[in-house]
């Protein structure tokens, strides 16, 4: 269940990058 939060963090970073574009 440690991979779940890790994926969310990665997704959040990608979302932030897309929002900046």
Curated annotation (Swiss-Prot):
Keyword Membrane on entry: no
Swiss-Prot/TrEMBL keywords: Amidation, Neuropeptide, Neurotransmitter, Secreted
Biological process, per Gene Ontology: chemical synaptic transmission; neuropeptide signaling pathway; regulation of heart rate; regulation of smooth muscle contraction
GO cellular component: extracellular region; synapse
Protein location: Secreted
Function text: Tachykinins are active peptides which excite neurons, evoke behavioral responses, and contract (directly or indirectly) many smooth muscles. Is a potent vasoconstrictor and secretagogue that plays a regulatory role in the central control of ventilation, in particular, the heart rate variability (HRV).
Name of this chain's protein: Neuropeptide gamma
Organism: Oncorhynchus mykiss (Rainbow trout)
